Each structure stands twice: as C-alpha cells, then as structure tokens.
Amino acid sequence: MNETMKSRFGKVAVMMGGNSCEREISLMSGQGVLNALRGQGVDAHAFDPAEKPLAALQSEGFDRVFIALHGAFGEDGTLQGALETMGIPYTGCGVMASAIGMDKWRSKLVWKAAGLPVPDFRLLADDSDFAAIEAELGLPMFVKPACEGSSLGVTKVRKAGELAQAYAEARKFDPLVLAEQFVGGGEYTVALLEGRALPAIKIEPATEFYDYDAKYFRDDTVYRCPAGMDDEHELAMRRLAEQGFAVLGGSGWGRIDFLVDEAGQPYLLEINTAPGMTTHSLVPMAAREAGLTYEALCLKVLEAAHVG
C-alpha cells in the first residue's frame, strides 16, 4: 500500500458480484479494477454485496466505493441511494441518472422529449396488438427487457407473427418489454469520462447482433477504434453522446450505444452507467485510444467518486 494513495483515496471497496443476472461479468470487471488499483498502491479490497451486508462498509472503515456491479441493485440507483444515506463517496452516476439509465424505455422517453434522435419504439404488454406493432415498426425489429443489461433476453424479430414469442422471452427477465425499430447502418459506442466523450468504437459482431456471448466471450467480434468515420461524423456522434449523458444527469463515467442509419445519422440506443471493465470491455479500449492506460482510467474514475 502506498501512503500517498492511502491519504488520497483512503480504504476503497471495489463492489463486485452481487445477485443480478450479470454477476459473472461483474466479478470479471471487479477483479480487473481491483488488480489495477492495488498495482498502483491503492488500499483496495473486494466487496461482494451478495456475501456481506452494506453496513459492513461502515463497520470495516471504507472511505469510498468503486462500483463494478452490473444490472439490478448495482446500476439502477438502489446502491447509489444506499451509499448516499451512508455518506460514502461512490463512482459513476448518481441515483436519478442510474435509475433512468437502467430503464431503456424511460431513458428513451427523456431523450425523445429533449429532441435527441432515438429509434422508434413501443412498450409491449400482454394485450398489445402485436400485428399492428410489427406493421408500425417494420421488420426486422428488436425486442428487449427494459431493465436488463448485457443483451440478456434480447430477440431479433425477423418474420411477421414472431413478436409475441419474443415478448414472452423478454418477459422472463423484466415485466417491462420494449419493441424497437431496426436501424441497419452499423453499431457504435461512445465512452464518457468526466462528461467528455472518448473516441467512438465501431462494433462488428460475428453473431447476427451484439449479444451476451459476442460482448464477453467471443474473440471474433471486431472492434474498430478509431471507428473509421470522417471527422465530421465522429465529432457529431461524440457531441450527441455528451448531450445524451447530460440530459439524463450523468456524472463520472459511462457509455452510450448508438445505431447508425444508411445515411450516417446516429441514434441514441441506450446508456450504461456502470460500464464493463473486462478484457473485452469497450471503455478501456476507447481510453487507450485517448492515451489512457487501464490503470490510469481506473484512477480517474475513482478520483471522481462523489456523494450527491
């Protein structure tokens, strides 16, 4: 342990694991962060809320929390609210931005109300007119749980009559289910650090779309950073990412995913307020392109820990 780092950050809990469907990914992210912080002399310790109560943060004398949890409880505002009441600084977005960002439906409503471009979408229910929605949004389309991450429960609907089955699959993960217009010009993501956009990344999945397997385990998913856009389109996407982040009240760091149409127009897809930090993760990739090592990125995120 480095005394300078001790005085700077105190005792740090790297919050990882948890009970969400994304536990496995969270453990990978958290271990990477833990190793990076310890390697720079930070007094960092693993903390799994599935194994011990949050009250242990106070009883064990932790001074700040690096949130490496994904999904429910970790990035939906619940944990953030608990840490606020304890007065313990934490990384990433606050309560409101985390809660809205976890909900793909409500975040799209906010972006749309702010005049920012989003793919057309519908909220589905048991009594929805699925045939009418297929006609309105067109095929193919995506169906996804509104409050689940890592593409869990996502289905690409290709043929008329398949929407009801896709809805039933998504309902296994969340009661709120979204149908979303397909935009076919490419998938991109933009990481944000301290409110500023990092270089965009183009995602070329080996699977038909960027699913759970492609995100975390396949080695044939192609990531291009620089993304290969001209300066005008790159800057426009970065600017839109910063706007989308600010409108939701984002702080610290995050990542916004985009779809681009055939004319090059970017559409805000969803926000990730507790991005992955695994070997396949995208924020570290964008940070490297901007001249930041993984270790430096972890320190920058930790430095921005806050209450309120």
Curated annotation (Swiss-Prot):
Domain ATP-grasp: where? 108-303
Reaction(s) catalysed by this chain, per the record, are: 2 D-alanine + ATP = D-alanyl-D-alanine + ADP + phosphate + H(+)
Q: Which cofactor does it need?
A: Mg(2+); Mn(2+)
For molecular function, the Gene Ontology terms on record are: ATP binding; D-alanine-D-alanine ligase activity; metal ion binding
Entry's EC annotation: 6.3.2.4
- HAMAP family this protein is in? Dala_Dala_lig (MF_00047)
PANTHER family (UniProt xref): D-ALANINE--D-ALANINE LIGASE, D-ALANINE--D-ALANINE LIGASE B
Q: Specify the protein name.
A: D-alanine--D-alanine ligase
Q: Which gene encodes it?
A: ddl
